[in-house]
Curated annotation (Swiss-Prot):
Pfam families per the UniProt record, alphabetical: Cystatin (PF00031)
Location in the cell: Cytoplasm
Protein name: Cystatin-A
Primary localization class, coarse: cytoplasm
SMART domains given in the database record: CY
Site entry (Reactive site), positions: G4
Gene3D superfamilies: 3.10.450.10
Length: 98
């Protein structure tokens, strides 16, 4: 991983799904929506003063959201923070930094 650069897109792992699940309540509060389906499809990561995860989430038939989650370094107090999101995405929309 190059510090500051985004990795190539990779299929979501169990760990990435767990990260997505942990910030789901933050996203639902910001979008004023409830997501019955919330499946991580793929992700990219970026090393900063911690790690940014860009995760493509499927929320229904051909409905996708891109989320950005910051995971702080182990010695810092907060662990996972939803720092951005993009709605109205499709399966083919590429994950990009935002």
């Amino acid at each position: 991983m190059i510090p500051g650069g985004l990795t190539e897109a990779k299929p979501a792992t169990i760990e990435i799904q767990e990260i997505a699940n942990m910030v789901k309540p933050q996203l639902e509060e910001k979008t004023n929506e409830t997501y019955e389906e919330f499946t991580a499809i793929e992700y990219k990561s970026q090393v900063v003063a911690g790690i940014n995860y860009y995760i493509k989430i499927q929320t229904g038939d051909n409905r996708y959201i891109h989320i950005k989650v910051f995971k702080s370094l182990p010695q810092q107090s907060h662990s996972l923070i939803l720092t951005g999101y993009q709605v109205d995405k499709t399966k083919d929309d590429e994950l990009a930094g935002f």
